[in-house]
């Protein structure tokens, strides 16, 4: 019974994607990386600052649109003209800020986690990129010291076929191996840096 339950549980955890859909493949691999990075490391606490900022900007834009609609309903045009003009400008300004935030701050980041210890705090980020009509999945794992701002990163650029089988099943163990390799490389650099500073 135990083996059957284990097999059924493994079957339920399998993620299958259309391997010809680049966007679906990227999101599935991102989810697998995030699960491995955060699920196996209790010392990493997930942070939602980037997501919350995006949600706040979207909420403000929607609020401006609702306010404009409500004002125009209670104060028909042309009385509502100044408010509508302000709302349109504010709406597109917020969308512009949201675009800049996504392009220059997020940069494909899908996981952010904070690691606290006695000496300092470190911020881990996982980001990815997969260009259209390209099978290469670029995964970047970075760590930044929140005190001195020093940032280090490790990258992996492999075909998505290295992590997905012929049936479109995401091979979590192979994803985990790659994530662990990048994480351990950064952790080793961190230990070397701390030992050098102590000497």
From Swiss-Prot:
Top-level taxon of the source organism: Eukaryota
SS bonds (residue pairs): none
Record's keyword terms, sorted: Endoplasmic reticulum, Membrane, Transmembrane, Transmembrane helix
Transmembrane segment boundaries: 50-72, 82-104
Membrane topology note: Multi-pass membrane protein
Keyword check for Nucleotide-binding: no
Subcellular localization, as worded in the UniProt entry: Endoplasmic reticulum membrane
Pfam families assigned: SPC25
Lumenal side: 73-81
A cellular component term, taken from the record's GO annotations: endomembrane system
GO biological process: protein targeting to ER; signal peptide processing
Cytoplasmic side: 1-49, 105-199
Family: Belongs to the SPCS2 family.
Subunit structure: Component of the signal peptidase complex (SPC) composed of a catalytic subunit twr/SEC11 and three accessory subunits Spase12/SPCS1, Spase25/SPCS2 and Spase22-23/SPCS3. The complex induces a local thinning of the ER membrane which is used to measure the length of the signal peptide (SP) h-region of protein substrates. This ensures the selectivity of the complex towards h-regions shorter than 18-20 amino acids.
Function (record text): Component of the signal peptidase complex (SPC) which catalyzes the cleavage of N-terminal signal sequences from nascent proteins as they are translocated into the lumen of the endoplasmic reticulum. Enhances the enzymatic activity of SPC and facilitates the interactions between different components of the translocation site.
The protein's name: Signal peptidase complex subunit 2
Lineage: Eukaryota, Metazoa, Ecdysozoa, Arthropoda, Hexapoda
